[in-house]
């Protein structure tokens, strides 16, 4: 947009994301995102936004406690402390989806692969391409073709 305050806020958010990103390993979200960009030509950041909730769900079994810790910065101290520990990871995912929907609505961005005009017939090619992406080596949960297809199918219609 043309609002300088909004542009500065986005630049600062991008900087903070870059600092955080440079000290972490990526996984299924980036693997699917790289493949979707290569096959369907959607922007990388948009792909990351679409796949983030699905990647969190996929890694929930092996990273439940870590995902649950994200609830504190996403929802605030009161909500975090009043949420039972065993529910925090699921609440984190719900909060991430809620925030994603608000951002997409505010910015007019698509929230699903279908809204991003990805052709459903491209999903198999995206899944096969993703399986060759090196980012999957560091994902906590191994990704098979059937898993990739489930994630892509879910991301096609759902936030």
Residue ranges and their predicted role:
Residues 53-159:
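Mobile late-domain/C-terminal helix-loop "cap" segments
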Residues 1-98:
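Active-site segments that bind and position negatively charged phosphate/pyrophosphate groups
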